[in-house]
Amino acid sequence: MTTKDAVLAFLEKDRGRFVSGPELAEKLSLSRTAVWKAIRALEAEGHEITAVKNKGYRLETGSDRLSAAGISACLPEKHRTCAIHFFETTDSTNTQAKRLALEGAPHGTIVAASEQTAGRGRSGKAFFSPDTGLYVTVILKPPAGMPDPQKITIAAAVAVCRAVEAQTALKPQIKWVNDVYLDGKKVCGILTEAVTDLESGGINSIVVGIGVNCAIPAERIPKELVGIVGSLNAEGLSRSRLAADIAAFVLDAFDDLDAPALIDDYRRRSFLFGKEIGFKRNGEALNGTVTGISDAGNLLVRLGSGETLSLSSGEVTIGKL
């Protein structure tokens, strides 16, 4: 870790509180001059740091510059050793994570970015990824066999909701299976993919990618997405902490994807219960009413005929097709 990153990580742990120059120098085994230079470098990068004589330095609660050091400082102690690869801009964090996985990146590796130039959603759809967002992918290494990717997606959706609620008064909800909504608009999408080793033909890893819309100015939302895409605009929201909280929960949940509490939490946050939806099955347009979510994470839909279908995948729209 560089001197600059070490200073940032220390300030991140005490965000909103003054830390004296001598304390920083002593705890990090640095000279006062080295601390001062690191502070100047961080300010030049856009971090909001207040310096007051006889008080020290304070990383402001409104400072929201995403960084590897900031994410690392916000991770729980047991996940502090996770490797973090940060990009200001990248094509896709999932693409980078797949490459790293095939190169031998360990379980728990985190890939994060402030902007994606080729973000992807399900079925290869483009994912709007402006530079104010949070795009984070976690590499998971199954100990044996292939876990149900839908349950990983479920864990990620719950992780996003919990992480947002930990920092704000916002109450996000989940639209089956992989979208998080706020006030009727999509603020997060999730893409879970398997990484296949071409030589062995086996599953090398699973990457779970999460894209969160943060502080997007209304004028930057493309016309075709107006009224559909929303944004987290809470004061004091830290993307570094959001990334750390999401990654930590996904890693914890991965150890027990069948835990009843996980699917119960997912059900509680779903806003589709009782709503009429439209979907396609084998090319046929169908409509029905959502009656629940199974323990496996399937969407239960009652058709007009009285038959109940269990949907394990696919897109659903609110209202009739």
Q: Across the structure, where does each feature detected by a protein language model lie?
A:
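Long, positively charged amphipathic alpha-helical accessory segments at protein N-termini or as interdomain linkers
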Residues: 1-30, 40, 44-45, 145-148, ...
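Short loop/edge segments at beta-strand edges and connector loops
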Residues: 88, 174-176
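N-terminal lobe of the biotin/lipoate ligase/transferase fold
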Residues: 2-165, 188
